[in-house]
Structures are given as C-alpha cells and as structure tokens.
UniProtKB/Swiss-Prot annotation:
Compartments it resides in: Membrane
Residue positions the entry lists as glycosylated: 64, 178, 184, 253
Keyword Electron transport: no
Entry GO MF terms: carbohydrate:proton symporter activity
Homology family: Belongs to the major facilitator superfamily. Sugar transporter (TC 2.A.1.1) family.
Protein name: Major facilitator-type transporter ecdD
SUPFAM superfamilies named in the record: MFS general substrate transporter (SSF103473)
Lineage: Eukaryota, Fungi, Dikarya, Ascomycota, Pezizomycotina
Membrane topology per record: Multi-pass membrane protein
GO cellular component, one term: membrane
Underlying gene: ecdD
Organism annotation: Aspergillus rugulosus (Emericella rugulosa)
Annotated keywords: Glycoprotein, Membrane, Transmembrane, Transmembrane helix, Transport
Principal localisation: membrane
Any single Pfam family the record assigns to this protein: Sugar_tr
Length: 541
C-alpha cells in the first residue's frame, strides 16, 4: 500500500485503521461475487442437470433443464437483489450501516441453506431468491459504509476494493466449480454452495467489532459516538483538533442540509439531486449492459455450447484476468481520476466486444441440430483473447468505478435512499439480462439463437458509455464527500468539473448553522473553545 499511496503531508493521524476497516467491509463483495459465479458452473454440471431435470433432454440426448428453467434459476437471484437493494435504505437509516450488514448476512445464510438441501427446482429457486435478497442489501450497504469511513485521498481505492472482492469471489467460485464438477454425486454442486457459510461467518465476525460510521452517527445526533468513531478511524484522541474539525465539517454540512427540509424519497427527484440520481442509475445500468455478467453467469455454458474444450478451465482463466485487472484500476481511479479511467475503459471495452462479435460470427456455423461447427480454431482462440481483453478494460475501469462514484455523489441526508436506488438499478438490469440471455443465445424453438452475435449488442452499449462519461460524469478525485456536494451545487456541466476547486459549501449559510451547533465533544477546554472550533471549521470550508 505504501508503495502506491502516500498520505498527504499535513494530514493528521493515521490512515491505515480506516483503510483496514473499510477494506475488511469490502469482504461483502466475496458473497456477491461467489454467489454470482457459482451458478455458471453448476448449470454445466452433469450430475446437477440430471438431478434437477424435469424430463427435458438437450440436443445431445442428455437430461437437462430447459432454457426457461435455466433463465428462472439464474435470474431469480437478481430479482432478490433488486428488492434487497431497495430495502437497504430503510435498514441502513433505521438500524445503522453496521447492524444492517449483520442482519443482511442472516437473510443470505437462509438462502444458502435452502440451496444446499434442495433436490428439485422450487426449493432451489427459493434459496436463490433469499440469497439474492441478502446480497442486494449487502451490495448497497458496503459502499455506503466504505464511503462514509474512508479518507478522501484514498476513497476511490477503498470503495473500489469492493469490486476487487467481487472478482475474488467469482474466481473462488470458478476454482470450486472446477474442483467438483467431475464428481458424480450431490457434492458436485453442494460443496461449492455450502462454502458460502464461511464467507458469511467471517463478515459477521468482523462487523461485530467494527465501529459505526461517523456520518450515520451525526445523522442520528449521537455526536459523542461520532467522535469516538472518528477517533478509531483516524487513530487520534477524541479531543484532537483534527477530529473536532472533521466532525465540525460533517455536522455543519448535515445541519445545512436539514435546514433545507426533511429528507424523503421525493427529495431525491428534485433539483440537482435528480441529476445525481440519474447519473448513478445510468452508470449502474451501463455497467450491466456492457455484457460482463453474460460472461460471469453464462460463460461456462456459452463456451461449452460454442465448441470450446475445457470450458471450466477457460472460465477459470477469465476470472483470473478479472481479479488481476481490478488492481491497476483501484490505483488509477485515485491517481488519474474518475473521468479518464471510465472513458478509457469504455473505448477499450467497445473495441474488444466488436472484435469478439466479428470473429465469433464469421468463423463458426451450426448443423441442423444446433451444434456449433468451428471453421477456424485459431480465430476462436483469438476470440477468447479479446474476451479477456474486454474483461481487463472492464475490471480496471467500470467495475470498481461504478461503486465508487455512486457511493460519493449523494449528500448525507439522501445518501442511503439514493444509493439503494442506484444499486437496485444495477440489479434490475442484472435480472433482465440474466433472464433474457438464454432466449437470446440458445438454439431451439422460441429462442433467438444469436450465439456470438450477442456481442454486437454489448458493443453498442459500450459505445454509448463513451458519450455518457463525457456528458454526465463529474470529476470527484481527492474531494471530501462534503466537497462533492459543493461541486454539484456550483458546477452545471460535468466537463467543467475537472477545473473546479473547493471553496466551502454555501459558506455563509453553513457558518450560520454551524455557529448554532452543539458538537458535544467533551474536552477540558470547555464550551467556549468548542464554539471557536466551529467558527474555524466553517471558515476552512
């Protein structure tokens, strides 16, 4: 860490406690990625297919599930995550970010239990739904917790670590699937599913000892607890000037926001908050429409149907690329900024998807039974290489950046609500794509049989990403969450955000509100010094 990032000079305290705490919370991404990744391999396991088949036989004459059953099994997780993400706002605001994550794990474990014991499709579907409900809650609460605890100069890396954890979860799923798919018993699919208990236990164990976020505690008027939380995160005494100044900034900002009216869902759709919400929702939607989860959900099955040998190994390779490519993206987002990283990634993804589509379409055919005929083996290998190149560009840009940006562009009073809606958008598109993909790709009656042509669709969406970044994404590198709020209030065009410098959020109004605020930080210097600190904090904004 020290080789890549250096704490800015003059910054009081230590950054490593906040980095470790926020980094550990990213472990929630393991649950997300692993649960997403297991199903691709499980659908391709012969024993699972025979066990859960209702009598349908595929083109090879083997017992299997139908396209509609496969679609339901994969997409039901995303349906659960959609409702879970929407539920994250009331849960996070009522019981807190920390206890919300703990409760979410309980729901997730229920889903894992049902999937593990299932021997038919209905209980398996129920398990996938409840697991999705838990994952949806976690997927909104983790970036929320991270963005509210991370130091501003490394916030992109820390929140982006959530995406890294997702890729690690996907990789672990492919490793377990590859290790058990040859088994001719229920262990072939039950072992990969049951391993998820371990991830949940680790996350809950850590959350029991980690602090609540200081911004949530300020929102609840528990200023003493907020000071203690900041003290743990910055490794400074509660009465240290830096702690009191940061606490003053957080509380003054929240006081100013609340002076404009109580927060509700309708407020998320007003003024520049609507612009931020549209930006966040479109960002998450386009992340899904880039085609990444086609590879993650159906990659193993697609490679198998396309005539590739060792499809489990290919999936393992693509997941290794996904993990390794996320690391440079975490560095780049704080080094070069959000806009350059997203723009470069969008261009790289578009070119890669176009080449995969052209190679796959022009070098393969089908026989009368729908089996793929490969005319050029070298071109197929090249297509795999470009899929890996696409994954590199995605993992180094849009993968982590979507979570980073949506976690930092909303003000405190609507942050949980807005973030839950942007995350729900991600899962809504995730569900739509996972449900429709079998019908779009597979051969047979009622199916579009696009095969590799589907990559033309992903190319078109990636091309749209380029314009979206240029016109909609604000540059927020190196800003506190309060300064990001100021940026959106002062700058109308995303293109002008690069030149903006923070000067304090509505300085006059916030000083007035800050002067009336009781920070309740007990120190020997008494209330008069507290008032002086409030004034100093207001002038420093």
């Amino acid at each position: 860490m020290g080789l890549l990032f250096k704490q800015p000079e003059g910054t009081a305290g230590k950054a490593w406690p906040a980095i470790l705490i926020s980094g550990f919370v990213a472990f929630g991404g393991i649950l997300f990625g692993y649960d997403t990744g297991t199903i691709s391999g499980i659908l391709a396991m012969p024993y699972w297919a025979r066990t859960f088949s209702t009598g349908y036989r595929d083109s090879t004459g083997q017992l299997n599930v139908t396209s509609s059953q496969s679609s339901a099994i994969v997409s039901i997780l995303s349906a659960g995550t959609f409702f879970g993400a929407l539920g994250a706002s009331p849960m996070g605001d009522i019981i807190g970010r920390r206890w919300g994550l703990i409760a979410s794990n309980g729901i997730f474990v229920l889903g894992v239990v049902l999937q593990t014991i299932a021997t038919s499709i209905p209980p398996f579907l129920a398990g996938r739904f409840f697991a999705g409900l838990g994952v949806g809650l976690i997927s909104a609460l983790v970036p929320l917790y991270q963005s509210e605890t991370a130091p501003k100069w490394i916030r992109g890396f820390i929140v982006g670590a959530y995406q890294f954890a997702i890729t690690v979860g996907l990789l672990l799923a492919s490793v377990l699937n590859n290790a058990t798919h040859h088994r001719n018993d229920s262990g072939s699919y039950r072992i990969p599913i049951a391993v998820q208990f371990a991830w949940s236990i680790i996350l809950v164990g850590g959350m029991l000892i980690l602090p609540e976020t200081p911004r949530y505690l300020v929102k609840k008027d528990n200023i003493q607890a907020a000071a203690r939380s900041l003290s743990k995160l910055r490794r400074l005494p509660e009465d240290h000037a830096a702690i009191r100044e940061e606490l003053a900034e957080i509380q003054a900002n929240h006081s100013f926001e609340m002076s404009l009216g109580r927060s509700g869902y309708m407020e998320c759709f007003q003024g520049n908050l609507l612009k931020r919400l549209v930006t966040g929702c479109l960002l998450q939607a386009l992340q899904q429409l880039s085609g990444i989860n086609f590879i993650m959900y159906y990659g193993t099955q697609f490679f198998k149907n396309s005539g590739f040998q060792n499809e489990f190994v290919i999936t393992l390779i693509t997941n290794c690329v996904n993990v390794g490519s996320t690391l440079p993206g975490l560095y780049a987002i704080d080094k070069w900024g959000r806009r350059p990283v997203l723009l470069t990634g969008a261009i790289g993804m578009a070119v890669s998807q176009l080449l995969v589509a052209v190679l796959g379409t022009t070098t393969t055919g089908q026989d009368s039974r729908g089996n793929i005929i490969v005319h050029d083996a070298a071109a197929q290998k090249a297509a795999i290489a470009f899929i890996c190149l696409y994954i590199f560009f995605f993992a180094a840009s849009w993968g982590p950046s979507a979570w980073v940006i949506t976690g930092e562009i909303f003000p405190l009073k609507t942050r949980a609500k807005s973030l839950s809606m942007t995350t729900a958008t991600n899962w809504l598109l995730n569900w739509a794509l996972s449900f429709s993909t079998p019908y779009l790709v597979n051969y047979g009656d009622g199916n579009a049989n696009l095969q590799s042509k589907i990559f033309f669709i992903w190319f078109g969406c990636c091309f749209l990403c380029i314009g979206f970044v240029h016109f909609m994404i604000y540059e927020t590198k190196g800003l506190t969450l309060e300064e990001v709020d100021e940026l959106y209030m002062e700058v109308d065009s995303a293109r002008d955000s690069v030149k903006w410098q923070p000067r304090g959020v509505a300085r006059g109004e916030k000083e007035a509100h800050g002067a009336e605020t009781d920070f309740a930080v007990e120190t020997a210097k008494g209330a008069s010094e507290q008032q002086e600190v409030i004034g100093d904090a207001g002038r420093s904004l």
